[in-house]
Design a protein with these regions (language model features):
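Active-site or metal-binding loop neighborhoods of secreted/extracellular toxin and effector enzymes
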Residues: 128-189
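A generic "functional-site adjacency" signal
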Residues: 30, 95, 137, 166, ...
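Alpha-helical scaffolds flanking conserved acidic
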Residues: 27-35, 134-141
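Short, surface-exposed acidic
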Residues: 25-31, 85, 184-185
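Peptidoglycan-targeting cell-wall enzymes and recognition modules
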Residues: 1-24, 38-135
Length: 209
């Protein structure tokens, strides 16, 4: 299982995550990713998707999928447990996951702005743009769509997308306050619309898709 956001275990892992990435990511990028992590692994770097060992499903802080891609390529750890720290699930694995995330070593970042029917994410086509993001709203949204790319994102169901994002943004706001000691502020007014997004794509590609 995972940890409650305000638990000592979750807080300790948040600070480890921040300390690992702060030299390369803005504090907003870090908190935005943490808001998503809260709803993926609940801050447990050794967690398997559905708490069941399955090398074809998700594993780790951000639920690397398939798990075999992360475990076989970036670690030598085997027999990872879903219930306790084993010889293969040690703190070094959590640090390794941060290193993999630092520059998206697994190549998971994908421009999915066309899946968002209500907010323009075209400024975050690249992972480098995400790492330098300057507000929590965009950070949480960009990580959800372009890194996580979960089933809700792929559904193109606006109501579900908005509800899922609201949960993750609330988590990100809590994480930001924990790791900085202050609230994130109101952030940008989400005035960028799908109409603007589609027009940009039309001007760029000459067609809608």
């Amino acid at each position: 299982g995972g940890y409650e956001t305000t638990s000592d275990e979750a807080k300790a892992n948040m600070f480890e995550f921040k300390d690992s990435l702060i030299s390369d990511w803005t504090i907003y990028a870090i908190a935005g990713a943490l808001g998503n992590i809260a709803n993926e692994s609940a801050f447990n770097p050794w967690r398997w998707q559905s708490d069941t060992v399955n090398y074809n499903a998700g594993y780790g802080l951000v639920q690397f999928t398939p798990a075999s891609g992360y475990i076989n390529e970036f670690t030598n750890y085997a027999n990872l447990s879903t219930s306790e720290i084993t010889a293969g699930a040690r703190p070094e694995d959590g640090a390794c996951q941060c290193d993999v995330l630092r520059n998206d070593s697994m190549g998971k970042w994908t421009d999915r702005s066309s899946y968002n029917l209500w907010y323009d994410l075209s400024s975050f086509e690249s992972f480098s743009a995400f790492k330098s993001v300057n507000n929590l709203y965009d950070a949480t949204m960009a990580f959800l769509y372009n890194y996580e790319g979960n089933a809700v994102v792929l559904s193109r169901d606006e109501a579900r997308q908005r509800a899922d994002f609201a949960i993750r943004y609330a988590s990100a706001s809590t994480c930001y306050e924990i790791i900085t000691g202050e609230p994130p502020g109101p952030g940008p007014v989400p005035s960028r619309t799908i109409e603007n997004n589609l027009m940009k794509k039309y001007l760029k590609y000459g067609f809608f898709f």
